[in-house]
């Protein structure tokens, strides 16, 4: 077995060989970014005990819901869910972190590293370049007000 981390492509042939040799319940993990990816892996490896979604869920926080409901969320519905999740994470960090505004700002900017990569680059750049919570919150407001 090798250690690939986040580089390269998933080696599905190696995974299949491992699955065939493995006597234990097996969980698939690797490059699941859409409902289609989930279905493809389920078809290709029907004996799986489960899947770990990871960064795909960070990029699209509604991925599990879309899978469960077998439909893509509408833009406004996605925005509402993302805004709710952001508010929850922001408030939890604000409550628990003891390093002040700068620590909260850095944590929240990290939150956006994988989140919504298909979003408007200008708006994401404004979030990442914000130097104060005031500027961050302005950038977030602009992000959630986009059409």
Where are these regions (language model features)?
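Short, small-residue-enriched loops and turns at beta-alpha junctions
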Residues: 1-8
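Alpha/beta catalytic cores of nucleotide-metabolism and tRNA/nucleoside-modifying enzymes
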Residues: 6, 13-28, 32-147
């Amino acid at each position: 077995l090798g250690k690939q981390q986040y580089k390269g492509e998933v080696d599905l042939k190696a995974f299949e060989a491992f699955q065939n040799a493995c006597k234990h319940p097996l969980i698939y993990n690797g490059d699941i970014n859409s409902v289609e990816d989930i279905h493809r892996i389920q078809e290709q490896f029907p004996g799986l005990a489960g899947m770990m979604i990871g960064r795909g869920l960070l990029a699209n926080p509604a991925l599990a819901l879309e899978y469960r409901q077998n439909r893509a969320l509408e833009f406004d519905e996605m925005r509402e869910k993302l805004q709710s999740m952001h508010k929850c994470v922001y408030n939890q960090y604000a409550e628990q972190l003891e390093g002040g505004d700068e620590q909260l700002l850095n944590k929240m900017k990290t939150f956006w590293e994988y989140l919504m990569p298909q979003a408007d680059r200008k708006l994401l750049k404004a979030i990442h370049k914000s130097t104060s919570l005031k500027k961050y919150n302005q950038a977030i407001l602009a992000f959630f007000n986009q059409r």
